[in-house]
Every structure is written in structure tokens, then in C-alpha cells.
Amino acid sequence: MRRLFIVLVFGLTAMLWPVASSAGAVGATAQAIGSLEADFNNDGFADLAVGAPTEAIGNLQGAGAVNVLYGSAGGVTGSGSQLFTQGAGGAAGTAEAGDGFGASLASGDFNNDGFADLAVGASGEAIGNVAGAGAVNVLYGSAGRLTGSGSQLFFQGAGGVPGSPEPDDLFGHALSAGDFNNDGFADLAVGFRLEDVAGAENAGAANVLYGSAGGLTGSGSQLFYQGASGVPGNLEAQDLFGSELSSGDFDNDGFGDLAVGVPDEAIGSDRFAGAVDVLYGSAGGLNGSGSQFWHQDAAGVVGTAQREDGFGSSLAAGDFNNNGFADLAIGVPGEGIGAAPSGDLAGAVNVLYGSASGLTGSGSQLFRQGAGGVGGTPEFDDEFGRALAAGDFNNNGVSDLAVGVPLEDIAGRENAGAVNVLYGAAGGLSGSGSQVFWQGPGGVAGTLEAFDWFGAAVSAGDFNNNGAADLAVGVPHEAIGPRFAAGAVNVLYGGGGGLTGTGSQGFWQGAGGVAGTAETFDQFGSSLINSDD
């Protein structure tokens, strides 16, 4: 049975929105070129954006909100934090029930002024009377902080953006920034996995908006889907192309490239096995020429494509062997380990390495709990690999990988959640010296509780500017007092020895200066900033 992140509260059905990942302090080649670490005020400290996509605005259930917390020498602080909602503080649009503002997040310097900007998915946005069509808000950085002044709202069929808004397209479900044409302005890829294409229901698609001195523009924007414009794969119903996006320079040619998750792609007769399309950048932007189609039955890729694996459900790019080519980690949260059902949905992560010709299956890896030094035991419904983030947590110049395991059972607490951390080296990622974190022990802030979903989202950034990436962990079902699923975020700090729970922090709305009020089912921490994967 396929595992869906669905919760029922007060008659509402809400999905745990897509996770976002970020790389911090990893070196330019590992980053999505042009994406710029999420430093909205350009003070040298990475900042943290946190989505609460089911936040109620007044009586508008699920309108959504985004908190922004700023970095400092002491790390992330709630002091001076901001709360953005549509139609307030200059942010474009109008808050409406079910908009899901904050469903996804991505950061890049879209106008190349030295300040990181923030793209916010509102995938449930109604366009006119078209419910769930989806939209993307863009907020711009400044010397003071992020501002709604000059903000933009993009959706299909307006301002040059190709396509037409249709019910439940979920435009903005996934976002990723990179400079795909290498003109110095970050561009934005937008996934909408429920797009119907040529009669193929929920085939999925992705738009690309290009940056300019005036910021993002729909002029020259592109529309990609499988089976057209050179994109590999057949156009099929229910593939969900565009469910996840990640940018990196996989062939190190100076142009950002884009990986697109297709987690419900059928491989042979195995439905929902999953795949990843990779599109390469050029002076003219992204194009299908030389694009690739990856899955577990592809040449060199470790593993076997099986029904309901969900290969491509999460993605993160980083230079895990420090050879100058970005590599790609691919979450396979439905992977079965051992005999079913005990190992069903235990989860795994594939890693493909970059080269002068792009990503290659040669030397690929498959990681799972309990093998090769990776901590933990593969168990039913753990979903190891549901979320991914790359960053140099030990400041040795090589990207490392954080892996969310949000449904991990810890000490009898069902679905408490955990995060595994794998470290990079000249030979690539390794389970040697890997770590496992969860709330409570080892100094990690918070209390170990059932159904918290620690690790549902992960994101890296150098919040204290010490040269090592730090890790933000979303805990969207954390109860704040009696308020179930109000949500929280933990921050763990990096250093020469890697990540540590010592000095870690816990943040939630209404405490420690964080703007807003913790309320039942806000799901603060469902999404985290996705700056450069």
C-alpha cells in the first residue's frame, strides 16, 4: 500500500507539503549556480525561511504563512524575525482558504543585486474560479531584510508564463533556483506535478522563469514535460513529473542544470517505481538536448526498480567527492529492505556522480540504514530518504548529506523521526563516521515524542558564518502545549568535527521572538528554504 503523508483535522484534508533542501558552505561547484545562499540582508550569515502552509489567517483555514529567521554570530535568532502572508506587508496576492502559501521555498539572487531573494509556492492558490491551480510569490532581499516591496505573483497563463491554470495543477508544489543560462541572474524552476498534459491526467510539468535586472520575468519562460522538447520518458498519466526539483552543475560547464523527480513513473510493469529526468543548461537556458533519464534499472545505478519505490521523491545536489562536478542524491523512501512487509517502505538513497559528460551511473551508490556503517535499522514505514539536504557540515571542503527519516520509531515512540548524516570524502559519500540525530539525546533540543515527524524537512546553511554548514530540521507535527501539529524547527550546528547536538536550538511561533502564534495544525517546519540544493 502506498504511504501518503495525509492528516485529517477538523474535517480538512491536508498534505504534508513537499520538503525543501539547501546546501550551505559547500563551494561554488556544488551549488546551483546563481542560487546564492539564503542571506536576505547580505550580512554574511545565512538566514532561515520556514513554511507553515496550513496556517490559518483569521478564519481562512490553510491560507499559509512563511516565517523568516535571521542568522547571526550566535546562530539563528528569533529577534527581528518576520511573518509573511499574502496581501500583508506588501506581499502580492490575497490570503484565501487552502492557498497553502509556504508549501515550497527556494532562494536565489534573481535580480543580481547581492541580496538573496525568496520564492514561495502557494500551490493551492485559486486563479479566478480555478481552485488549486497554484501560484508562486517572489519577495526580494535588501540591506534591511526581506521585503514585500516589489513582490511578484506568477501563475500559468499570465505575464508570459506558458500554460493555462487548471483545477488542482498545484503550480508551485516544488521550486529550485539556479543560473541555467549563466547570465549572472538566478532563474527559477517551478514544478506542478498534477498538470494534465495532452489528456494524460496528472502527468506533471515544470516551468522555468528567468532572472533579470528587474527580477524574475515570464518573458522567455519555458514549459517542460516528458516526451516533448527532448525530455526523456513517455507522457503518461499519474507520473507526477515535477514533484521534486534540484539544481546543480553536474557537468561543470558553468551552466546550472536541473534534476526533476518523477516518483510515480512506471519502470516496465513496476508502477510507482520512480525516475529522475536531468535537463542541462546552456547559453539559451535549459533544454532537452543531452538530457538524461535515470531509474534503478538504468545502467550502473545500484538497486532494482520495484513497485512503489518512489525513486526521485527527494533530491539534493552537492559535490560529495570534491572533484568540481556536482553530484545528485536521490531519495527512494518506498524502497523495501529485506522481506516484506517488515522491510517495506524502509527507504534508501541513491547517489549518482557528476562528470564532464554530466551525471553517470558509474560508481553510483545505494545507502540504507544498518548497512555500510549507516546508523539505524531498516524498518517498515521508516521512509529513510524522504528529505535530503547537502552541506559541508565539518568544513573540510567536501559536501555531506543529511537524510530525513521522518517516520522512524524511536524507543517505542511511533513516527518520532530521525536524521542520518553521511560525510563526503575524496571517494564520495561514506557511512563511516555517519551520525543519527533525534530529539532529546545528545543535546538535541526538544523531547522525544510519537508522531512528531522530526526530519520531514531538512535544510543546510551557515547560520553563524563559521565556515561549516549547519542543519535545520523540520518537525511539523511537534505539539506546542496542547496544540497538535503546530510545528517546530530544530537547528544543529556544524564545526570541524561535524554536526553536534550541543548548542542546538528549537524554534516555534510565538516563542523566542519568532513572529506568529503556535496553533493546531499550522505545520510550521513543513518546508524549509531551498537555496542551492
Language model regions located:
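Conserved beta-strand/short-helix segments
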Residues: 3-7, 20-533
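Hydrophobic helical h-region of N-terminal Sec-dependent signal peptides
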Residues: 6-10, 14
